[in-house]
C-alpha cells in the first residue's frame, strides 16, 4: 500500500513544479488506484485501499495532494475495520477425486510451491512424505517453504538450481501449489500437470494443465489426504535429493575458496 503525494489540487493541470498524476503513474502496477481531493473522500478511499491490499493481495495506491495533507480530517461514515472471517475454499469432492487418482497412479511426482502456499507448510511436508515427492519452490516462497523441510530441492528459474528443474522434467506428475511462476520455458512439456490456485483465472497461463483446481492450498490438501494412499517407493525422491545435495556441496566449495591473499574472497 502506497500513499503517493502530489502538488496542491489548485495546481492540477498547470504543469506545476513536480506536478504528477498518480493515476497514470501507477495504473499498470496496481489493483486499487485513486486520488483523494477532499477531506471527506480520504478516509473512505483509505479504507478501500487497505481492503484491496489485505484481502485481495493487490497493490493499492492512494494519491494525496499537498493541500489535502494539510487539511483537517473528517470522520469516516463507513467501516474502518472490515476483515471477513476465514472461509474454507477448496474444490468439489468430485474434482478432488480426480486429483487423487492422478496421484495414486503416478510414480515420479514433484511438488512446486509459490507464495500462495505459504500458510500450508505443515500440510505440504505431510503431502510430500505421503507421496514421496521432492519439493521445489519459487523465490517468493523460499522463506515459507524451505525451513524444516527434508524434501526440498531448491528453486528453479533464473535464480534457481538445476535440481528443481531436473526433478520437474523427470516427473510423470507435476503439482503446482499457489504459484504463478512466470517462466514458461522452465516448465516441462511431457508430464501431466495439476495446478491449485486461490485465483482460478491464473490457472493454465504458464503451462498446459491437465487438471486445474481453484482453492486455498491448505484447505485443498487437508481434504485430499483421506483420498490418497502413502507410497512406499522413494527411489525418485532419493535421486532428486542426491542431485540437490551434490549441487549444494559444489556451491559451498566455491564460497569457501579463499583465493589469493590480496584478492577479494571468494
Q: What are the language-model segments listed below?
A:
Residues 2-4, 26-78, 102, 164-194, ...:
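Structural signature of the thiamine diphosphate
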Residues 4-10, 140-144, 180-181, 199-200:
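Acidic, glycine-rich active-site loops and adjacent beta-strand->loop/helix elements
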Residues 7, 64-70, 115-117, 141:
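Glycine-rich beta-alpha junction loops
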Residues 9, 25-29, 72-84, 146-149, ...:
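Gly-rich Lys/Arg/Thr-decorated short loops/hinges at beta-loop-alpha junctions or inter-strand turns
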Residues 9-28, 147-151, 204, 208:
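Active-site-proximal loop->helix
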Residues 40, 63, 75-76, 87, ...:
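Phosphate/pyrophosphate-binding active-site segments
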Residues 91-92, 98-170:
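Anionic-ligand anchoring segments at beta-strand to alpha-helix junctions in alpha/beta enzyme folds, i.e.
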Residues 126-133, 184-202:
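A short, gly/pro- and small-residue-rich
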Amino acid at each position: 500500500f502506497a500513499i503517493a503525494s502530489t502538488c496542491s489540487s489548485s495546481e492540477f493541470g498547470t504543469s506545476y513544479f513536480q506536478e504528477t498524476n498518480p493515476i497514470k503513474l501507477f495504473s499498470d502496477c496496481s489493483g486499487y488506484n485513486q486520488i483523494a481531493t477532499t477531506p471527506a473522500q480520504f478516509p473512505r478511499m483509505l479504507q478501500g485501499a487497505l481492503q484491496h491490499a489485505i484481502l485481495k493481495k493487490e497493490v493499492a495506491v492512494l494519491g494525496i495532494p499537498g493541500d489535502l495533507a494539510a487539511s483537517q480530517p473528517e470522520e469516516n461514515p463507513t467501516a474502518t475495520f472490515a476483515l471477513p472471517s476465514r472461509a474454507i475454499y477448496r474444490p468439489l469432492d468430485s474434482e478432488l477425486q480426480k486429483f487423487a487418482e492422478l496421484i495414486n497412479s503416478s510414480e515420479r511426482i514433484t511438488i512446486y510451491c509459490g507464495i500462495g502456499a505459504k500458510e500450508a507448510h505443515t500440510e505440504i511436508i505431510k503431502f510430500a512424505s505421503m507421496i514421496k515427492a521432492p519439493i521445489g519452490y519459487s523465490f517468493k516462497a523460499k522463506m515459507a517453504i524451505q525451513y524444516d523441510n527434508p524434501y526440498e530441492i531448491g528453486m528453479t528459474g533464473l535464480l534457481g538450481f538445476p535440481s528443481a528443474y531436473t526433478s520437474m522434467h523427470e516427473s510423470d506428475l507435476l503439482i503446482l501449489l499457489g504459484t504463478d511462476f512466470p517462466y514458461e520455458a522452465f516448465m516441462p512439456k511431457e508430464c501431466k500437470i495439476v495446478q491449485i490456485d486461490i485465483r482460478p483465472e491464473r490457472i493454465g497461463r504458464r503451462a498446459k494443465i491437465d487438471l486445474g483446481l481453484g482453492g486455498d492450498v491448505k484447505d485443498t490438501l487437508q481434504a485430499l489426504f483421506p483420498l490418497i494412499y502413502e507410497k512406499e517407493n522413494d527411489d525418485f525422491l532419493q535421486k532428486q535429493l542426491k542431485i540437490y545435495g551434490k549441487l549444494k556441496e559444489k556451491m559451498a566449495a566455491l564460497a569457501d575458496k579463499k583465493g589469493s591473499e590480496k584478492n577479494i574472497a571468494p
